[in-house]
Amino acid sequence: MSNKDYKKLYLVTDYRIPFNELLEKTKEALIGGVSIVQYRAKNKETKEMCKEARALKKLCDEFGALFLVNDRIDVALAVKAHGVHIGQDDMDVSIAREIMPKDAIIGVTVHNKEEALKAIKDGADNLGVGALFSTNSKDDATLMTLETLREIKSVSNIPLYGIGGITPYNLNKDILENLDGVAVISALLNSDNIREKSKEFLNILSK
């Protein structure tokens, strides 16, 4: 298996954690092997978001990790993020593709095959698929069935990242064979040992 074939561990930040603490937690996750960080912040002023995103981008650069911004293309551009992640209620992928640099990564959350096909057609680089399990990070998350995940996998030629309530203990072979990695919030950031928890995830992802 080459490096590019390894399933990736993707950290999504939690805006409920004080930022200085979040920065330290993110560093531990990067040391543990996280290779993608998505900055997600709700109800914050743009100036504060840019300051936080810039600090996280610098940290990701130190570890050679990709840094993405959730929803806010303006913030992503301001801090020279590697890309953005957008949801179904955000800007169309085709418009985001026009605004972002040509080499920018655009990830899109999808919930079914139809949304996946549209995102791919419009120029998405990867898809977040879920929620695979119940999650405290998003109140309105609808659970995705294994059948739907397989349908999305069957029509996708870009990486799929599982999202929603994922832990090292609920990932099974049926789920993993349809994913290129997993995106995690609570299972990492609420861990007593983030570095070791990251390694635990990667050990499961490498099997």
From Swiss-Prot:
Binds 1 Mg(2+) ion per subunit. Condenses 4-methyl-5-(beta-hydroxyethyl)thiazole monophosphate (THZ-P) and 2-methyl-4-amino-5-hydroxymethyl pyrimidine pyrophosphate (HMP-PP) to form thiamine monophosphate (TMP). The gene is thiE. This is Thiamine-phosphate synthase. It holds the Pfam family TMP-TENI. One of its GO terms (molecular function) is thiamine-phosphate diphosphorylase activity. Its cofactor is Mg(2+). Belongs to the thiamine-phosphate synthase family. GO terms for cellular component: cytoplasm. Disulfide bonds: none annotated. It comes from Clostridium perfringens (strain SM101 / Type A). It catalyses: 2-[(2R,5Z)-2-carboxy-4-methylthiazol-5(2H)-ylidene]ethyl phosphate + 4-amino-2-methyl-5-(diphosphooxymethyl)pyrimidine + 2 H(+) = thiamine phosphate + CO2 + diphosphate; 2-(2-carboxy-4-methylthiazol-5-yl)ethyl phosphate + 4-amino-2-methyl-5-(diphosphooxymethyl)pyrimidine + 2 H(+) = thiamine phosphate + CO2 + diphosphate; 4-methyl-5-(2-phosphooxyethyl)-thiazole + 4-amino-2-methyl-5-(diphosphooxymethyl)pyrimidine + H(+) = thiamine phosphate + diphosphate. CDD domains: TMP_TenI (cd00564). Mg(2+) binds at D71, D90. InterPro entries: Aldolase_TIM (IPR013785), ThiamineP_synth_sf (IPR036206), ThiamineP_synth_TenI (IPR022998), TMP_synthase (IPR034291). It is an enzyme of class 2 (transferase). Its EC number is 2.5.1.3. Pathway: Cofactor biosynthesis; thiamine diphosphate biosynthesis; thiamine phosphate from 4-amino-2-methyl-5-diphosphomethylpyrimidine and 4-methyl-5-(2-phosphoethyl)-thiazole: step 1/1.
